[in-house]
């Protein structure tokens, strides 16, 4: 039997798509007559649509232009050939290509001109232009971003006469609540579609190191909708439209949005600190299933199973143990490990939280203060392009200290430079390092890193990265 291949698509729109003419007919969810006494969403939309904008971006994308010849040279020898050899016989290894793209965004502060969107909409942009529903255009600058949560905040230059959107409490959402998606699909202009909340706490299973705790909706969402608004029937923001799953790249009734509470927490951190300071609970685990529930004598069928509690972590200090099952955070139900992972990461370091967990069939409540996730600070504090797209954590095992690469995003600079998941970085520019903090210190004095000392299996070699 032939399997259908489903693809997770970010939904920003490259302008090259516009050169292809097509018309797609898709089934559209409709709101039943009992929603309210009103027979139209128009009054609500008239207030909300001016707060949803279109972002046009221009920039230069980095692409790998190395000759395949260099790929045949063992990693341990490449360092000794030097830059001149690579330029003469293999190309410079990196080139830039102009790109343009379209996406959507939401005005969240009218007086200051703040617009919330997805990171993948503005990633790599040198120029950002924001167009309002009334046709006015503003130049914009990037205020801050968080790649792992796919959130970015931009600010309009000289904002005036803007409309902002109000945040809803996304923790109060229920499956079956009505949703309205607003954005600019395929560059056609602002478009409104409707549906319901299909699922909450959804993860796509992506292996990219991102934090996923999506609202799933069947409202029609297509390319160009990225960064646009998902609102409730009161016109309040419940999510930022981010991705779709589709066999064809178009709407298939499965769309994902970042919850408004999660986005709001990230924006507050960006405005306060200039970066996202992730919280760290200090647990490892997975999803609760029927077999685990039976083995650990609990009746719950949903929750986050704790398989390991890290030493000296917030979780250990609060008394959590391996085998505990977390069922709620701050009074809100936890359905999966991915959900609590995302909520902890976006809550912020130093924040106090409460957890409800099951142990030996009994429910317990505990409060704790989250620690800082130092591994999440690398992209904000350093300028080492070769590590773009790599998820890092401190490594201390088997008598070796360094930085472990736990995940590599496909087609990222880290992947292009030859880094692989499982690599251990133990040195930079011939200086030994034992953790991410030491790497940051080296880069403060030597920002132009040229070589990383890598342990890969039984191999110890230098990898040329500049």
Swiss-Prot record:
**Under which main EC class is this enzyme filed?**
hydrolase
Q: Where in the cell is it found?
A: Periplasm
Q: Which InterPro entries match?
A: PDZ, PDZ_sf, Pept_S1C_Do, Peptidase_S1_PA, Peptidase_S1C
- Gene Ontology biological-process entries: protein quality control for misfolded or incompletely synthesized proteins
Active-site residues, as the UniProt record annotates them: 120, 150, 226
Which molecular-function annotations from GO does this UniProt entry contain? serine-type endopeptidase activity
Q: Which UniProt keywords apply?
A: Hydrolase, Periplasm, Protease, Repeat, Serine protease, Signal
Q: Where is the PDZ domain?
A: 270-361, 367-458
Q: Which GO terms describe its cellular component?
A: periplasmic space
Query: Does the UniProt entry include the keyword DNA damage?
Result: no
Q: Which residues form the signal peptide?
A: 1-29
Primary location class: periplasm
EC number(s) of the enzyme? 3.4.21.-
Record's keyword annotation contains Hydrolase? yes
Q: Which family does it belong to?
A: Belongs to the peptidase S1C family.
Q: Provide the protein name.
A: Probable periplasmic serine protease do/HhoA-like
* Organism field: Haemophilus influenzae (strain ATCC 51907 / DSM 11121 / KW20 / Rd)
């Amino acid at each position: 039997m032939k399997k259908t291949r489903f693809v997770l698509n970010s939904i920003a729109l490259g302008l090259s798509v516009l050169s292809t003419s097509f018309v797609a007919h898709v089934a559209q969810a409709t709101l039943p007559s009992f929603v309210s006494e009103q027979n139209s969403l128009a009054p609500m939309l008239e207030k909300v649509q001016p707060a949803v904008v279109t972002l046009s971006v221009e920039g230069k994308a980095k692409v790998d232009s190395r000759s395949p010849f260099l790929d045949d040279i063992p990693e341990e020898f490449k360092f000794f050939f030097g830059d001149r050899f690579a330029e003469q016989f293999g190309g410079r290894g990196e080139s830039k290509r102009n790109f343009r793209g379209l996406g959507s965004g939401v005005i969240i502060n009218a007086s200051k001109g703040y617009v919330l969107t997805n990171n993948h909409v503005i990633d790599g942009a040198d120029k950002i232009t924001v167009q309002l529903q009334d046709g006015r255009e503003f130049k914009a600058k990037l205020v801050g971003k968080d790649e792992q949560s796919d959130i970015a905040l931009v600010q309009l230059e000289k904002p005036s006469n803007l409309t902002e959107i109000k945040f809803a409490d996304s923790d109060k959402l229920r499956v079956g609540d009505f949703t309205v998606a607003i954005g600019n699909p395929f560059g056609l202009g602002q478009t409104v579609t409707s549906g319901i909340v299909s699922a909450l706490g959804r993860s796509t299973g992506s292996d990219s190191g991102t934090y996923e705790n999506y609202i799933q909706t069947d409202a029609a969402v297509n390319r160009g909708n990225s960064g646009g608004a998902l609102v409730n029937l009161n016109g309040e923001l419940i999510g930022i439209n981010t991705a779709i799953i589709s066999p064809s790249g178009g709407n298939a009734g499965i769309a994902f949005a970042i919850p408004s509470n999660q986005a709001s927490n990230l924006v507050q951190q960006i405005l306060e600190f200039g970066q996202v300071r992730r919280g760290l609970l200090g647990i490892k685990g997975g999803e609760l299933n029927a077999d685990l529930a039976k083995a650990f004598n609990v009746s719950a069928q949903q929750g986050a199973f704790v398989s390991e509690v890290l030493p000296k972590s917030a979780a250990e200090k609060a008394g959590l143990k391996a085998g505990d099952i977390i069922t709620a955070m701050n009074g809100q139900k936890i359905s999966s490990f991915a959900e609590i992972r995302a909520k902890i990461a976006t809550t912020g370091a130093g924040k106090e939280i409460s957890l409800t967990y099951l142990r030996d069939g009994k429910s317990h409540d505990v409060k704790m203060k989250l620690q800082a996730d130092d591994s999440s600070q690398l992209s904000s504090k350093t300028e080492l392009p070769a590590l773009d797209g790599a998820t890092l954590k401190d490594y201390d095992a088997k008598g070796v200290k360094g930085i472990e690469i736990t995940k590599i995003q496909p087609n990222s600079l880290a992947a292009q430079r030859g880094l692989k998941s499982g690599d251990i970085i133990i040195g930079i520019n011939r200086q030994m390092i034992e953790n991410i903090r030491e790497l940051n210190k080296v880069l403060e004095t030597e920002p132009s890193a040229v070589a990383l000392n890598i342990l890969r299996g039984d191999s110890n070699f230098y990898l040329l990265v500049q």
